[in-house]
Amino acid sequence: MPRNTSHEHDHGLMVEASKPEVAPPPRYQVLLLNDDYTPMDFVVTVLEQFFNLNLEQATQIMLHVHTRGRGVCGVYSREVAESKVAQVNEFSRMNQHPLLCTMEQA
C-alpha cells in the first residue's frame, strides 16, 4: 500500500503562516504659527484653500492660532505634510505675509 507523502511528517501540529507586523507610517501635524502682522482673513483663506476647510472650521482654527500661538491645520503622511508646509509658506511669501507653517510628528 503506498504511503501518503502529504501526511508522512504530520505530527498533529498545525503550522500557521507568519505575517510580518507592519507598523503604520508616522503621521505629521501641520501647524500654523501666530504672528503680529498677518491679517486674520488671510489665515482663513489659507486654511480654506490649502486644507479644504469650510469658513466655520477655518475661522475656529484661525482664532485658536491667534489666542494660543499655534494651531493644527491637519494630520497627514510625511510627504503630504511637507508639501502643504511648502505650499503655505510660498503662498504667504508671495503675498508678503510672515505667516509660518511647520510640521511635527503627531
UniProtKB/Swiss-Prot annotation:
Its GO biological process annotations read: protein catabolic process; proteolysis
User: Which Pfam families does the record cross-reference, listed alphabetically?
Assistant: ClpS
Q: List the disulfide bonds.
A: none
Q: What does this protein do?
A: Involved in the modulation of the specificity of the ClpAP-mediated ATP-dependent protein degradation.
Q: How does it assemble?
A: Binds to the N-terminal domain of the chaperone ClpA.
Q: Which PANTHER family match?
A: ATP-DEPENDENT CLP PROTEASE ADAPTER PROTEIN CLPS, ATP-DEPENDENT CLP PROTEASE ADAPTER PROTEIN CLPS1, CHLOROPLASTIC
Recorded hits in NCBIfam families, A to Z, give:
PRK00033.1-2, PRK00033.1-5
Q: What is this protein called?
A: ATP-dependent Clp protease adapter protein ClpS
Gene, per the UniProt record: clpS
